[in-house]
Amino acid sequence: MYIAKYWGDFIGGSDDSLSLVEFLEGLDKEEITLKEIFTGIGLDRQNMDFRQTVGNLRFINSIGLEIDFHYAIDIVTDLAAILLECRITGHLNLRELYNNEDTQNRCIQVIATEKEYTAIKDALEDFVKNPKSYDLYEMIGDDIIEMAEIVKELRKELLQYEL
């Protein structure tokens, strides 16, 4: 998995990351649009501003439980890494994200329009420039500076793979 160098503590390492993988599994399809993801969990209500998380970012899982997301920027950074993986390898195996036997051994491809792709890169740039302006800062404190450096590298790679 190409994004293994990013997927860990700050990107892919949160409760929101686990919830995102569960959401993607629940879609039970190979090709998933970014719009489906945004609409499915409520990120579309953020209007591409992820500094402060708008309430009610959630979905209902396959057994009927309501799963909440806490920090919009966590989801966006995870999705950026997933987009990068899909750009480089053409797909993402959900099981590789956590090497968990409970996770389906299934490949997906997340598709973004040029406008969505640009919006994600812009959101990452804003995070890199203003990490302490994000609600996640309240949770992780100054570690957000280290996260911003990782996101900076991720964004740089995304720029190499323009639509």
Language model features with spans:
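Amphipathic protein-protein interaction modules
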Residues: Y71-D135
